[in-house]
UniProtKB/Swiss-Prot annotation:
This is tRNA-specific 2-thiouridylase MnmA. The lineage of its organism: Bacteria, Pseudomonadati, Pseudomonadota, Betaproteobacteria, Neisseriales. Pfam families: tRNA_Me_trans (PF03054), tRNA_Me_trans_C (PF20258), tRNA_Me_trans_M (PF20259). The gene is mnmA. ATP binds at residues 36-43, 62, 151. InterPro entries: MnmA-like, MnmA-like_C, MnmA-like_central, MnmA-like_central_sf, Rossmann-like_a/b/a_fold. Residues 173-175, 334-335 are annotated as: Interaction with tRNA. It comes from Chromobacterium violaceum (strain ATCC 12472 / DSM 30191 / JCM 1249 / CCUG 213 / NBRC 12614 / NCIMB 9131 / NCTC 9757 / MK). Belongs to the MnmA/TRMU family. Disulfide bonds join 127-223. It is found in: Cytoplasm. SUPFAM superfamilies: Adenine nucleotide alpha hydrolases-like (SSF52402).
Length: 384
Protein backbone atom coordinates (compact mmCIF):
# COMPACT_ATOMS: atom_id res chain seq x y z
CA UNK A 1 0.00 0.00 0.00
CA UNK A 2 1.42 3.41 -0.96
CA UNK A 3 2.30 6.22 1.42
CA UNK A 4 -0.76 8.26 0.44
CA UNK A 5 -2.94 5.55 1.90
CA UNK A 6 -0.76 4.92 4.95
CA UNK A 7 -0.79 8.59 5.89
CA UNK A 8 -4.56 8.94 6.07
CA UNK A 9 -5.68 10.08 9.52
CA UNK A 10 -7.00 7.42 11.88
CA UNK A 11 -5.84 4.60 9.62
CA UNK A 12 -3.20 2.01 10.40
CA UNK A 13 -1.40 -0.18 7.88
CA UNK A 14 0.38 -3.30 9.06
CA UNK A 15 1.52 -6.78 8.14
CA UNK A 16 -0.17 -9.76 9.76
CA UNK A 17 1.72 -10.96 12.78
CA UNK A 18 3.05 -7.48 13.49
CA UNK A 19 1.98 -4.44 15.49
CA UNK A 20 -1.31 -5.82 16.80
CA UNK A 21 -3.12 -3.12 18.75
CA UNK A 22 -3.66 -3.77 22.44
CA UNK A 23 -7.13 -2.28 22.79
CA UNK A 24 -8.85 -1.99 26.14
CA UNK A 25 -12.25 -3.60 26.59
CA UNK A 26 -15.21 -1.20 26.52
CA UNK A 27 -17.01 -0.84 29.83
CA UNK A 28 -20.45 -1.17 28.20
CA UNK A 29 -22.12 -4.48 27.45
CA UNK A 30 -21.99 -3.86 23.72
CA UNK A 31 -19.84 -6.08 21.55
CA UNK A 32 -16.50 -5.33 19.95
CA UNK A 33 -16.97 -6.30 16.32
CA UNK A 34 -14.30 -6.22 13.63
CA UNK A 35 -15.78 -5.67 10.18
CA UNK A 36 -14.09 -6.78 6.97
CA UNK A 37 -14.21 -3.60 4.87
CA UNK A 38 -13.88 -4.11 1.11
CA UNK A 39 -14.67 -0.62 -0.09
CA UNK A 40 -18.02 -1.82 -1.43
CA UNK A 41 -21.56 -0.89 -0.44
CA UNK A 42 -22.30 -4.15 1.40
CA UNK A 43 -19.46 -3.98 3.93
CA UNK A 44 -20.04 -0.22 4.24
CA UNK A 45 -23.65 -0.71 5.32
CA UNK A 46 -22.60 -3.61 7.56
CA UNK A 47 -20.26 -1.29 9.50
CA UNK A 48 -22.87 1.49 9.60
CA UNK A 49 -25.62 -0.81 10.91
CA UNK A 50 -23.44 -2.20 13.70
CA UNK A 51 -22.33 1.29 14.70
CA UNK A 52 -25.97 2.41 14.78
CA UNK A 53 -26.72 -0.49 17.11
CA UNK A 54 -24.16 0.87 19.55
CA UNK A 55 -21.40 -1.70 19.13
CA UNK A 56 -17.71 -0.87 19.20
CA UNK A 57 -16.83 -1.32 15.54
CA UNK A 58 -13.34 -1.63 14.08
CA UNK A 59 -12.85 -1.78 10.32
CA UNK A 60 -10.16 -3.86 8.65
CA UNK A 61 -9.37 -3.61 4.95
CA UNK A 62 -7.75 -6.85 3.78
CA UNK A 63 -5.00 -6.43 1.21
CA UNK A 64 -4.93 -9.93 -0.27
CA UNK A 65 -3.13 -9.19 -3.52
CA UNK A 66 -0.13 -7.02 -4.34
CA UNK A 67 1.54 -8.42 -7.48
CA UNK A 68 0.15 -5.73 -9.75
CA UNK A 69 -1.40 -3.04 -7.59
CA UNK A 70 -0.38 -0.38 -10.12
CA UNK A 71 -1.83 -1.87 -13.31
CA UNK A 72 -4.95 -0.52 -14.99
CA UNK A 73 -7.19 -3.36 -13.84
CA UNK A 74 -6.36 -3.34 -10.12
CA UNK A 75 -8.85 -1.43 -7.96
CA UNK A 76 -7.29 -2.13 -4.55
CA UNK A 77 -6.07 1.43 -3.96
CA UNK A 78 -9.43 2.97 -4.81
CA UNK A 79 -11.22 0.31 -2.76
CA UNK A 80 -9.02 1.12 0.25
CA UNK A 81 -9.69 4.84 -0.14
CA UNK A 82 -13.43 4.18 -0.38
CA UNK A 83 -13.27 2.07 2.79
CA UNK A 84 -11.44 4.89 4.57
CA UNK A 85 -14.06 7.43 3.50
CA UNK A 86 -16.80 5.17 4.84
CA UNK A 87 -14.95 4.64 8.13
CA UNK A 88 -14.64 8.42 8.47
CA UNK A 89 -18.37 8.98 7.98
CA UNK A 90 -19.43 6.05 10.18
CA UNK A 91 -16.99 7.19 12.86
CA UNK A 92 -14.88 4.07 13.33
CA UNK A 93 -11.18 3.26 13.36
CA UNK A 94 -9.89 1.32 10.38
CA UNK A 95 -6.75 -0.67 9.68
CA UNK A 96 -5.22 -1.90 6.44
CA UNK A 97 -3.83 -5.38 7.00
CA UNK A 98 -1.70 -7.27 4.51
CA UNK A 99 -2.76 -10.89 4.03
CA UNK A 100 -1.04 -11.25 0.65
CA UNK A 101 1.36 -13.99 1.78
CA UNK A 102 -1.43 -16.03 3.34
CA UNK A 103 -3.51 -15.56 0.22
CA UNK A 104 -0.76 -16.73 -2.11
CA UNK A 105 0.11 -19.72 0.04
CA UNK A 106 -3.43 -20.89 0.80
CA UNK A 107 -5.54 -19.73 -2.14
CA UNK A 108 -3.58 -18.67 -5.22
CA UNK A 109 -1.26 -21.69 -5.24
CA UNK A 110 -4.34 -23.95 -5.19
CA UNK A 111 -5.89 -21.89 -7.99
CA UNK A 112 -2.84 -22.42 -10.23
CA UNK A 113 -2.57 -26.11 -9.37
CA UNK A 114 -6.19 -26.75 -10.30
CA UNK A 115 -6.03 -24.85 -13.57
CA UNK A 116 -2.80 -26.58 -14.59
CA UNK A 117 -4.62 -29.90 -14.02
CA UNK A 118 -7.42 -28.86 -16.38
CA UNK A 119 -10.00 -28.18 -13.67
CA UNK A 120 -11.95 -24.99 -12.96
CA UNK A 121 -11.56 -23.97 -9.30
CA UNK A 122 -13.55 -21.42 -7.34
CA UNK A 123 -10.95 -19.42 -5.38
CA UNK A 124 -13.58 -17.27 -3.67
CA UNK A 125 -14.80 -20.33 -1.74
CA UNK A 126 -11.28 -21.01 -0.47
CA UNK A 127 -10.65 -17.31 0.23
CA UNK A 128 -13.61 -17.27 2.60
CA UNK A 129 -12.52 -20.41 4.45
CA UNK A 130 -8.79 -19.62 4.62
CA UNK A 131 -8.52 -15.82 4.65
CA UNK A 132 -11.71 -14.03 5.67
CA UNK A 133 -12.79 -16.59 8.25
CA UNK A 134 -9.36 -17.83 9.31
CA UNK A 135 -6.47 -15.38 8.89
CA UNK A 136 -8.73 -12.33 9.31
CA UNK A 137 -10.69 -14.00 12.10
CA UNK A 138 -7.46 -14.81 13.96
CA UNK A 139 -6.31 -11.21 13.56
CA UNK A 140 -9.63 -9.89 14.88
CA UNK A 141 -9.43 -12.14 17.93
CA UNK A 142 -6.01 -10.67 18.71
CA UNK A 143 -7.71 -7.26 18.71
CA UNK A 144 -10.00 -8.55 21.43
CA UNK A 145 -13.04 -8.91 19.17
CA UNK A 146 -16.17 -10.73 20.26
CA UNK A 147 -16.83 -11.60 16.63
CA UNK A 148 -16.26 -10.55 13.04
CA UNK A 149 -18.81 -9.28 10.55
CA UNK A 150 -18.78 -9.28 6.76
CA UNK A 151 -21.08 -7.98 4.05
CA UNK A 152 -22.03 -11.46 2.84
CA UNK A 153 -25.67 -12.14 2.09
CA UNK A 154 -26.25 -15.10 4.41
CA UNK A 155 -27.84 -15.78 7.78
CA UNK A 156 -26.80 -17.65 10.89
CA UNK A 157 -29.08 -19.31 13.40
CA UNK A 158 -27.87 -20.58 16.76
CA UNK A 159 -29.90 -23.30 18.44
CA UNK A 160 -28.86 -25.48 21.38
CA UNK A 161 -25.21 -24.54 20.87
CA UNK A 162 -25.19 -25.39 17.15
CA UNK A 163 -24.63 -22.71 14.53
CA UNK A 164 -26.63 -23.09 11.32
CA UNK A 165 -25.51 -21.35 8.13
CA UNK A 166 -28.60 -20.31 6.20
CA UNK A 167 -29.53 -18.64 2.95
CA UNK A 168 -30.13 -14.91 2.93
CA UNK A 169 -33.68 -13.58 2.81
CA UNK A 170 -32.82 -12.11 -0.59
CA UNK A 171 -32.33 -15.39 -2.46
CA UNK A 172 -31.24 -13.53 -5.59
CA UNK A 173 -28.16 -12.28 -3.69
CA UNK A 174 -27.62 -15.27 -1.38
CA UNK A 175 -23.91 -16.09 -0.91
CA UNK A 176 -24.13 -19.15 1.34
CA UNK A 177 -22.74 -21.15 -1.61
CA UNK A 178 -19.39 -19.39 -1.13
CA UNK A 179 -19.44 -19.99 2.64
CA UNK A 180 -20.11 -23.73 2.67
CA UNK A 181 -16.61 -24.59 3.92
CA UNK A 182 -17.06 -22.65 7.16
CA UNK A 183 -17.09 -24.88 10.22
CA UNK A 184 -18.67 -24.50 13.64
CA UNK A 185 -15.79 -22.64 15.30
CA UNK A 186 -15.76 -20.11 12.45
CA UNK A 187 -19.53 -19.65 12.37
CA UNK A 188 -19.54 -19.17 16.15
CA UNK A 189 -17.44 -16.02 15.74
CA UNK A 190 -19.15 -14.60 12.64
CA UNK A 191 -22.24 -12.50 12.04
CA UNK A 192 -23.92 -11.48 8.79
CA UNK A 193 -25.91 -8.27 9.36
CA UNK A 194 -27.20 -8.15 5.76
CA UNK A 195 -28.76 -11.61 5.83
CA UNK A 196 -32.25 -10.27 6.54
CA UNK A 197 -32.03 -7.28 4.19
CA UNK A 198 -32.63 -7.08 0.46
CA UNK A 199 -29.98 -5.52 -1.76
CA UNK A 200 -32.27 -2.65 -2.78
CA UNK A 201 -32.70 -1.79 0.90
CA UNK A 202 -28.93 -1.92 1.46
CA UNK A 203 -28.38 0.70 -1.25
CA UNK A 204 -31.20 2.83 0.16
CA UNK A 205 -29.64 2.72 3.63
CA UNK A 206 -26.26 3.66 2.17
CA UNK A 207 -27.79 6.68 0.44
CA UNK A 208 -29.60 7.80 3.59
CA UNK A 209 -26.40 7.49 5.62
CA UNK A 210 -24.47 9.50 3.03
CA UNK A 211 -22.00 6.70 2.36
CA UNK A 212 -19.83 7.32 -0.72
CA UNK A 213 -20.20 3.69 -1.82
CA UNK A 214 -24.01 3.87 -2.13
CA UNK A 215 -23.97 3.73 -5.93
CA UNK A 216 -20.69 1.85 -6.35
CA UNK A 217 -20.88 -1.03 -8.80
CA UNK A 218 -20.68 -4.52 -7.30
CA UNK A 219 -17.41 -6.33 -7.94
CA UNK A 220 -17.55 -9.24 -10.36
CA UNK A 221 -15.25 -12.07 -11.34
CA UNK A 222 -12.36 -13.58 -9.43
CA UNK A 223 -11.13 -11.13 -6.80
CA UNK A 224 -7.44 -10.98 -7.75
CA UNK A 225 -8.10 -10.86 -11.50
CA UNK A 226 -10.59 -8.02 -11.41
CA UNK A 227 -11.68 -6.75 -14.82
CA UNK A 228 -8.54 -7.82 -16.69
CA UNK A 229 -8.84 -10.46 -19.47
CA UNK A 230 -8.64 -13.89 -17.86
CA UNK A 231 -6.36 -15.43 -20.49
CA UNK A 232 -3.92 -12.54 -20.25
CA UNK A 233 -3.73 -13.00 -16.49
CA UNK A 234 -3.28 -16.78 -16.53
CA UNK A 235 -0.52 -16.62 -19.15
CA UNK A 236 1.67 -14.81 -16.61
CA UNK A 237 1.77 -17.86 -14.37
CA UNK A 238 1.13 -20.98 -16.47
CA UNK A 239 2.66 -22.05 -19.80
CA UNK A 240 0.27 -22.45 -22.71
CA UNK A 241 -0.04 -25.73 -24.59
CA UNK A 242 -2.15 -25.47 -27.77
CA UNK A 243 -3.88 -28.54 -29.15
CA UNK A 244 -6.82 -29.82 -31.15
CA UNK A 245 -10.54 -29.27 -30.69
CA UNK A 246 -12.29 -32.52 -31.52
CA UNK A 247 -15.81 -33.92 -31.60
CA UNK A 248 -16.62 -36.98 -29.45
CA UNK A 249 -15.89 -39.23 -32.45
CA UNK A 250 -12.46 -37.66 -32.96
CA UNK A 251 -13.14 -35.28 -35.83
CA UNK A 252 -10.84 -32.24 -35.66
CA UNK A 253 -12.86 -29.02 -35.91
CA UNK A 254 -10.40 -26.44 -34.66
CA UNK A 255 -7.50 -25.63 -32.35
CA UNK A 256 -7.47 -24.58 -28.71
CA UNK A 257 -4.85 -22.33 -27.09
CA UNK A 258 -4.52 -24.38 -23.90
CA UNK A 259 -6.99 -26.56 -21.97
CA UNK A 260 -6.74 -24.37 -18.88
CA UNK A 261 -8.48 -21.50 -20.68
CA UNK A 262 -11.72 -23.41 -21.17
CA UNK A 263 -14.46 -24.66 -18.87
CA UNK A 264 -17.28 -27.12 -19.41
CA UNK A 265 -20.32 -25.53 -21.01
CA UNK A 266 -18.27 -22.67 -22.47
CA UNK A 267 -19.61 -21.30 -25.74
CA UNK A 268 -17.84 -18.00 -26.29
CA UNK A 269 -14.28 -17.80 -27.50
CA UNK A 270 -14.10 -21.16 -29.28
CA UNK A 271 -13.55 -19.45 -32.67
CA UNK A 272 -15.34 -22.21 -34.57
CA UNK A 273 -18.55 -21.45 -36.44
CA UNK A 274 -21.72 -23.49 -36.18
CA UNK A 275 -21.51 -24.91 -39.69
CA UNK A 276 -18.57 -27.30 -39.41
CA UNK A 277 -20.85 -30.33 -39.63
CA UNK A 278 -23.75 -28.62 -41.30
CA UNK A 279 -26.34 -28.32 -38.52
CA UNK A 280 -25.56 -24.70 -37.65
CA UNK A 281 -25.93 -25.09 -33.88
CA UNK A 282 -23.40 -23.40 -31.58
CA UNK A 283 -20.46 -25.33 -30.17
CA UNK A 284 -19.94 -25.98 -26.46
CA UNK A 285 -17.07 -27.43 -24.47
CA UNK A 286 -18.14 -30.91 -23.29
CA UNK A 287 -14.92 -32.33 -21.89
CA UNK A 288 -11.14 -32.38 -21.76
CA UNK A 289 -8.79 -35.17 -22.82
CA UNK A 290 -5.93 -34.21 -20.52
CA UNK A 291 -3.39 -36.89 -21.62
CA UNK A 292 -4.07 -36.16 -25.29
CA UNK A 293 -4.31 -32.38 -24.78
CA UNK A 294 -7.58 -32.31 -26.71
CA UNK A 295 -10.65 -30.19 -26.09
CA UNK A 296 -13.89 -32.10 -26.72
CA UNK A 297 -16.64 -29.96 -28.22
CA UNK A 298 -20.24 -30.69 -29.17
CA UNK A 299 -23.00 -28.83 -30.95
CA UNK A 300 -26.22 -27.85 -29.23
CA UNK A 301 -26.94 -26.62 -25.70
CA UNK A 302 -28.76 -29.84 -24.80
CA UNK A 303 -26.27 -32.32 -26.23
CA UNK A 304 -26.30 -35.54 -24.12
CA UNK A 305 -22.64 -35.12 -23.15
CA UNK A 306 -23.50 -31.83 -21.44
CA UNK A 307 -26.20 -33.40 -19.25
CA UNK A 308 -25.27 -35.54 -16.23
CA UNK A 309 -27.59 -37.32 -13.77
CA UNK A 310 -24.92 -37.71 -11.08
CA UNK A 311 -21.74 -36.13 -9.80
CA UNK A 312 -19.06 -37.24 -7.38
CA UNK A 313 -17.41 -34.93 -4.89
CA UNK A 314 -14.38 -35.13 -2.62
CA UNK A 315 -12.59 -32.85 -0.15
CA UNK A 316 -15.85 -32.70 1.76
CA UNK A 317 -16.56 -29.98 4.32
CA UNK A 318 -19.64 -29.71 6.52
CA UNK A 319 -21.01 -26.70 8.39
CA UNK A 320 -22.65 -28.80 11.13
CA UNK A 321 -20.88 -30.94 13.75
CA UNK A 322 -21.89 -34.15 11.95
CA UNK A 323 -21.96 -35.01 8.26
CA UNK A 324 -25.47 -35.28 6.80
CA UNK A 325 -27.01 -38.72 6.55
CA UNK A 326 -27.69 -40.23 3.12
CA UNK A 327 -31.05 -39.06 1.84
CA UNK A 328 -33.02 -36.44 -0.03
CA UNK A 329 -31.70 -32.88 -0.25
CA UNK A 330 -31.21 -30.10 -2.77
CA UNK A 331 -27.92 -28.89 -4.20
CA UNK A 332 -26.19 -26.33 -6.38
CA UNK A 333 -23.23 -27.35 -8.53
CA UNK A 334 -22.50 -23.75 -9.49
CA UNK A 335 -23.37 -20.33 -8.13
CA UNK A 336 -26.60 -18.69 -9.32
CA UNK A 337 -28.19 -21.96 -10.46
CA UNK A 338 -31.53 -22.93 -8.94
CA UNK A 339 -31.51 -25.57 -6.22
CA UNK A 340 -31.92 -29.04 -7.72
CA UNK A 341 -33.49 -31.97 -5.88
CA UNK A 342 -30.99 -34.76 -5.31
CA UNK A 343 -30.10 -37.82 -3.27
CA UNK A 344 -26.89 -37.93 -1.23
CA UNK A 345 -25.09 -41.27 -1.22
CA UNK A 346 -23.35 -42.72 1.84
CA UNK A 347 -19.99 -41.05 2.45
CA UNK A 348 -17.14 -43.49 1.84
CA UNK A 349 -13.44 -42.65 2.23
CA UNK A 350 -14.15 -38.93 2.25
CA UNK A 351 -16.14 -39.00 -0.98
CA UNK A 352 -19.83 -38.94 -1.85
CA UNK A 353 -22.08 -38.68 -4.87
CA UNK A 354 -25.24 -36.76 -5.67
CA UNK A 355 -27.94 -38.19 -7.92
CA UNK A 356 -30.32 -35.57 -9.31
CA UNK A 357 -33.98 -35.91 -10.20
CA UNK A 358 -33.24 -33.96 -13.37
CA UNK A 359 -30.00 -34.10 -15.32
CA UNK A 360 -27.61 -31.24 -14.61
CA UNK A 361 -26.02 -29.14 -17.32
CA UNK A 362 -22.23 -28.78 -17.65
CA UNK A 363 -21.19 -30.23 -14.29
CA UNK A 364 -17.64 -28.91 -13.97
CA UNK A 365 -14.71 -30.63 -12.18
CA UNK A 366 -13.06 -28.27 -9.70
CA UNK A 367 -16.25 -26.36 -8.93
CA UNK A 368 -18.14 -26.89 -5.68
CA UNK A 369 -21.32 -28.86 -5.14
CA UNK A 370 -23.17 -27.42 -2.15
CA UNK A 371 -25.88 -29.29 -0.27
CA UNK A 372 -28.97 -27.72 1.33
CA UNK A 373 -31.82 -28.81 3.56
CA UNK A 374 -34.37 -26.09 2.89
CA UNK A 375 -32.56 -22.84 3.68
CA UNK A 376 -29.85 -24.54 5.75
CA UNK A 377 -26.48 -24.84 4.02
CA UNK A 378 -25.04 -28.20 5.08
CA UNK A 379 -21.70 -28.00 3.27
CA UNK A 380 -20.43 -29.82 0.22
CA UNK A 381 -17.32 -30.75 -1.69
CA UNK A 382 -15.23 -30.36 -4.83
CA UNK A 383 -16.68 -31.90 -8.00
CA UNK A 384 -14.46 -34.64 -9.40
Amino acid sequence: MDEGIRASGGIRACQTGKQKQGRKRPVTGKKRIVVGMSGGVDSSVTAWLLKQQGHEVIGVFMQNWEDDNDDEYCSIKQDALDAMSVADIVGIDMEIVNFAKEYKDRVFSYFLKEYSAGRTPNPDVLCNAEIKFKAFLDYAMELGADCIATGHYARKLEQDGTHYLMKAVDHTKDQSYFLYRLQQHQLAKAIFPLGDIRKTEVRRLAEEAGLPTAAKKDSTGICFIGERPFREFLQRYLPTSPGQMVTPDGKVVGEHIGLMYYTLGQRKGLTIGGSRDGNGEPWFVAGKDIPGNKLIVVQGHDHPLLLKPTLSMADLSWTLPDAPAPGEYSAKNRYRMADAACTLSPIVDGQASLTFQEKQWAVTPGQSAVLYHGDICLGGGIIQ
